[in-house]
Every structure is written in C-alpha cells, then in structure tokens.
Amino acid sequence: MVELEKRRRPPPQLQHSPYVRDQSNSQGMTKTPETSPPKRPMGRARSNSRSSGSRSNVDIDQYTIPPGLDLLPTASSPPSVHQVSQQQQLSPILANKIRSPFENQSQDQNDNSIDPTPAGQVTIPVEAVSPPALDELSKFQNGSTETLFRTGSPRKKHTHIIILKSLNATFETKFLVVPFKPDGLKLGRPVTNSVNKNNSGSKRDLFSQQVRPDNGNFDSRVLSRNHACLSCDPTSGKIYIRDLKSSNGTFVNGVKIRQNDVELKVGDTVDLGTDIDSKFEHRKISAYVEEISVIPLMNTVSDPTNLVMKKQDHTNKNNGNSTNINGIKIDRGHHNQHIPIRSHLKENYTEAGVTSATTAQRAAFEAAMFGDINNSELDDDILGPETEVLSGIFINNSAGTSINLINMIKTLTTELSLEKQELEKLHSMQNFMQNYTINLDFINKHMIDMNEKHLLKLSTALQKTLSENNDALLKESEDQLKEIKQQNNKVKSACSLKEKQNHEKLQELESELRELNLQIEEERGKNLVLTQSNFNGGINNDNNAKVKQNDSREEKKDTEDTLISTEELGVVEGKRTRVSKGMLFGVVAISFGLVATAVKQLPQ
C-alpha cells in the first residue's frame, strides 16, 4: 500500500486557478535537482504574485468545496517539505504565471523523487484531471457558462447603477446595473418563444413577465431585440451607450448615434426607436437619465457557504473514505494531516444566515456614506503592494499564503480606510459643532447686525420707493387739476360769450317787438278810424238805398207797363257798382280787425 501511494503523483496544477502556486517560475525560489527539495536563496525576495480577488483570472466562487472538509481534524505534527508542496497546491493562492504541461510534468517528477512518507504520514491519492475538466473549472458554476473572467481584469469593488425615468409613460422606472467593458447590458425588446403563435394574449403575458425594472427589456414594437447596449469603462467609471444596428435607431439628446460609444450623463434623454402611430404598442421608448450611482460592493470576502456551487459534483466512495471534487478524487482518510483547518470557522460559517441581515444593513450604510467614493482610485492607496507583505509571511518555511488570511487582511485594510474616512468626517463635524457653539454669541450678534443693516437698507429703499411714487402721484394729480381748471375756464368763457350773444339777440327781439307794437297801435288807430268812417258811410248808403228803392218802386209801379229806357238801365247799373264798393270796404275793415287781435295775442 505504501509503495502504491509512493508511485502516485500529486494532483496537477490547474490552469487559470487561484489554488496553484508556481514554485518553478516564482521569484525568490530556485529549482534544484530532483533529489533535493527547492532551496530558498539568502535574503528576502519580492513575490510577483498578487492576492486573490485583485488580479486573479478566476474567482474563488467558481470552485466547489465539499462541506465535509470543515469537519476534518487539524494536523498534529509539522508537515514535511512534500506535504508543504501539496498544501500549496491545494491552498487557494493566486498565481499570475501559468505553467505549461511540460513544466507540470517536470515538477511532478521532482515531487515523485522526494520521499513523501515520513513517519506516520502518507500522501493524498488523487486522480489526474483531464484538460476538458480544466476548461470546465474556468467557467461559472451558477447555471451560466457564457461569462468568463478575463486575464488581467481590474478589481471590481464597486458597481455603477443608472436610473432611467420614462418621459412618455411607456415603462416603469428602471434601475440598471451597468457591467464593465467588454461586457454590456442589452436594451431591446424581449424574445418570446411561444409555442402557440396565434395566442397573442399568452405572448403579451410573456412580454410582461420578461419586462422588469431591473433589466433592459422594454415592451414596445418599434424596438429591435438587440437595440442598444450599455457599458461602463472600468478605468474612468463613465457609462457609454452604443447602437446595435437597430432598425429604428437610437437617439441621445435628439441626435442619432451609430455603432460607436456615446457617453451618458445625468440629465441626458435617450430615445429608443421612433413613433410609428399614436397607439401605445407602437410608441418609442423615451427615457431620462435621472441619476448615476456608484455603489461599493460589500462582503467581497467569499464565505465558505458561498463557495459551494449550485451544480456541485460531490460523491462519497470507498465507504466514506474518498471524496470527489469535480473529477479530483481525494482520499479522505489521508487528507486529515495535510490541510490544517481552523475549528472556529465552522461556528462562524454556520451563522451565515443570522448575519445576512446585518450585512445588508451594513451594505446600505456603506452605500449611503461612501457611495460617492471611486474604489478604483483607492486600490493602490488602500491595499498597496499587498503581495510584498503577504507573500513573505510564510516564505521562510516555503509555505504559501492562505486565501483566508489574504482576504481577511484585505477586508481589514478596506474597513480601516473606510473607518478612517468616517472618522475624518466625524472629526470635521465635531470641529464644526465646537466652533459653532464657541462662536454662537458672535454669530448671533453678527447675524443681528447683518439683519439690522439689511432691515435699514430695506427701509431706506422702501421709503425712497414710496417717496418717488408719492411725488409721481402728486405731480400727476397737479397736472390733472391744471388741465381741469383750463377746461373749466374755457367752458366759462364759452358760456359767458353765449350768454352775451343771447342777451344781444334778446334785446334785438325786444326792440323789434316794440316797433311791431307801435306799428300795431298805429294800425289799430287807423283801423278804428276806418271802421267808424265805414260804419257812418254804410248807414248813409243804406238810407239812400232805401230811398232810392222806394222811389224806384214807385217809378216801377208807374211805369210797369212802359218800356224801360236805357237811362233807367244805366241808373240800375250805377246802383249795383255802389253796393259792390261798400261791401269791399267792409271786408277790408274786418281783415284789419283780425290782424289787430292777432298782434295782441303775440307774447310780449
């Protein structure tokens, strides 16, 4: 059994794995012949490897650790050189330089040449891992095998969140986590793989299920499935948008963009597509960049409970004495003396569910206090040349640095820097409060003086304004009064002139009336004389006519039988003319009387 275990070689180093330390290429270690362990040169040399989580190619969460490893007892005796080598291979340490299979083979030969079995200790029986298994280990084990961590990618201790608010009520407010380049967040219409194509209601339900406030899907027919893409520059922290050859185009502040990156800032408007008609399903997506937040990623140290992946390939064989970790079989009975595990970690890790709420509260507090701090600028200042310190901790005994210690020191340095900044803020607040309380009387007096000066300025300005307004009103009223007086004088002069004209006209009318009265009196006298004369003449004429009539009657009686002579006819005609003349004179007298009565009735 011992000879069989001697012939078995240790597990090969995994490519792109943080669980491997390159002993052959690392600075500070020299490769010796196969019959002797590696020798360390005199003096301290600086290690080129970086701590995990900073420059690693693959995250720790990509590997599956069996939960039974926490229950293994610690080693009772110090490990040998070969055991330290295997412990370095199984311990999670970052290696920037990946060895080729030929180097792995030479290293395996060197390890086989060393006596691996001191008293009471044996090696770990491990099966070789094929190259396809190495590729599988380099991928995510959380259900998606599309995203890979790229070599040399910077630490991502913060994330950018962009808040898009709708301008035309086409979607709910979105809170999008923008990934770093070369990754991107797709914006577009969700893809539905509905079996029943005629059922439009089910398709609409699928659309509504896929459109959420935390993804880039929008429910609009004018959008393409791959319409636009959001990405963040890891060096500058700027957020960019680019069009993905959409049919209806992408517009930033009303300007159509192409396939190149365009920076987004707070206050910009983003239009996806164009309006086809007034219906809701054919409207464009008009969004407003309300805010861009920088949130630090809390709890970057992965708990062992998080190291166990969803797709864990763990089986127990040989009556519970062997463990299979993704194709690597480890003898559980012989592993207990090679990987020392602290017994107190189990108690802390079992309380992960209890401390999750505290972690969430702390994350919210840190995001509120330090959300405006760009962690990429603090990496070198906070952590510094961390591997120079951390790699030299176990360099004297040819042991690697534990990933837990590295993460613990990183977490402590980060927390110390944040606490220092918080303390500086508190100190500044304390200084402000002290200065405020000390200078409170002076500040109050100064404020009172300033208020009095301000009040005086306001009062003088108000008085000046009121006086100017009063003067303007007085001047305006005086002008109006003068104008009214002038108009009154004009009216008085016009009235006096009119009265004078009326008086003169009245005098003229009175004089004319006097003259008419005199003329009427004269006419009355004349009429009276004429009437008397006419009356006397009429009586005489009547008497003469009667006498003549009597005479004529007598003559007629005498000469009834005789012929009337021409002389008698002439006499008769003369009588007729006399009668007509008397009648004419009477008519004239009557007319004069009527005129006199009419003149008397006229107003004086």
From Swiss-Prot:
Transmembrane domains' residue ranges: 579-598
InterPro entries (UniProt xref): Cent_Immune-Sig_Mod, FHA_dom, SMAD_FHA_dom_sf
Every FHA domain range: 185-257
GO biological process: cellular response to pheromone; protein targeting to vacuole; re-entry into mitotic cell cycle after pheromone arrest; regulation of cell cycle; TOR signaling
Listed Gene3D superfamilies: 2.60.200.20
Cytoplasmic side: 1-578
Region entry Disordered, spans: 1-89, 539-561
Pfam annotation, one family: FHA
Recorded superkingdom: Eukaryota
Membrane topology: Single-pass type IV membrane protein
Disulfide bonds: none
Subcellular localization, as worded in the UniProt entry: Endoplasmic reticulum membrane
Residue ranges of coiled coil: 404-563
Residue intervals annotated with topology Lumenal: 599-604
Keyword tags: Cell cycle, Coiled coil, Endoplasmic reticulum, Membrane, Protein transport, Transmembrane, Transmembrane helix, Transport
Quaternary structure and interacting proteins, as annotated: Component of a complex at least composed of FAR3, FAR7, FAR8, FAR10, FAR11 and VPS64.
Note: Present with 377 molecules/cell in log phase SD medium.
Protein name in the entry: Vacuolar protein sorting-associated protein 64
Source organism per UniProt: Saccharomyces cerevisiae (strain ATCC 204508 / S288c) (Baker's yeast)
